[in-house]
């Protein structure tokens, strides 16, 4: 009988979850009968030899690598801060926040039962499952957050940024993941939900940036995620800082959107 590679890894305790198994596989650390395998869904007999080589993932999911890059590139510090992880899923961003000194993380997701068991039992984590961020109000948290990450799917950031902004301190910061397939018009999204056109990537980044400025969030840094999304989409990291309402907000990005998109395609395509 044959099974998916990620399932076989879970059954053999080579990974604590399918998400973690996929992360090992996509990182090129998994070998089947001595051959490197890079597809989690490939079917193998139950008798094959599976090895995990190289560096194992430092977080409960590969999502943590995305926030890790943002923190390093954008000079974001989370030490002693209260944070939110919007679209937490298994908790890769939450894990990264805790490992970088966050004292509390509100892990918010519309789903249920996804947050890693280690994080679910961590007293610093407030697990807010079955929760749509669009309807969360300050009273639900009881305290403002210093920082929030946003990694959501099947919804535009233009529907999410304002509710998140309303939950931040006066000097709060956001790192959001821009996913072109959920920002572009349906006619611009290709097969399997993949957007490959750099011009569309530039267009959606500029749309999110301009919207952020309209709600008094200053665009400070822009880069691209070090890993692609599940279907192979290139994703982008945007760093925003909160400004008082009614004040002038300038675009402080030190690089052009076009240059970041070109670099992303050069490295990840």
Where are these regions (language model features)?
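A basic, amphipathic helix-loop patch mediating RNA/tRNA/ribosome contacts
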Residues: 1-48, 82-83
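Conserved class I S-adenosyl-L-methionine
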Residues: 79-89
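Short, glycine-/aromatic-enriched active-site segment of Class I SAM-dependent methyltransferases
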Residues: 180-197
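Conserved SAM-binding loop of SAM-dependent methyltransferases across substrates and taxa
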Residues: 90-101
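A short glycine-rich, Lys/Arg-flanked "PGG" loop and its adjoining helix->strand segment in the class I
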Residues: 158-175
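Glycine-rich helix-loop-beta junction characteristic of Rossmann-like nucleotide cofactor-binding loops
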Residues: 14, 72-79, 139-142
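S-adenosyl-L-methionine
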Residues: 106-159
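Flexible, glycine-/basic-rich loop-and-beta segments that form/coincide
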Residues: 234-269
């Amino acid at each position: 009988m044959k099974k998916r590679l990620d399932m076989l890894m879970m059954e053999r305790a080579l990974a604590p979850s399918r998400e973690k198994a996929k992360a090992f596989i996509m990182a090129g650390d998994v070998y089947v009968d001595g051959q490197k395998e890079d597809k989690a869904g490939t079917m193998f007999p139950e008798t094959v030899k599976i090895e995990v080589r190289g560096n194992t993932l430092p977080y409960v999911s590969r999502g943590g690598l995305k926030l890790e890059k943002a923190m390093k590139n954008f000079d974001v510090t989370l030490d002693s801060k209260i944070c939110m992880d919007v679209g937490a899923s298994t908790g890769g961003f939450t894990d990264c926040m805790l490992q970088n000194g966050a004292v509390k993380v509100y892990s918010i997701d519309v789903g249920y039962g996804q947050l890693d068991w280690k994080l679910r039992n961590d007293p610093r984590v407030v697990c807010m499952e079955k929760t749509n961020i669009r309807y969360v109000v300050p009273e639900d948290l009881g305290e403002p957050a210093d920082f929030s990450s946003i990694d959501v799917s099947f919804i535009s950031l233009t529907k999410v940024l304002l509710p998140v902004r309303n939950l931040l301190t006066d000097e709060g910061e956001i790192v959001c993941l821009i996913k072109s397939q959920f920002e572009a018009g349906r006619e611009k999204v290709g097969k399997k939900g993949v957007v490959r056109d750099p011009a569309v990537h530039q267009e959606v980044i500029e749309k999110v940036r301009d919207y952020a400025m309209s709600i008094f969030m200053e665009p400070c840094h822009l880069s691209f995620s070090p890993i692609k999304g599940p279907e192979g989409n290139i994703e982008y990291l945007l760093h925003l800082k909160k400004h008082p309402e009614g004040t002038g907000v300038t675009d402080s990005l030190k690089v052009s959107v076009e240059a970041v998109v070109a670099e992303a395609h050069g490295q990840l395509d």
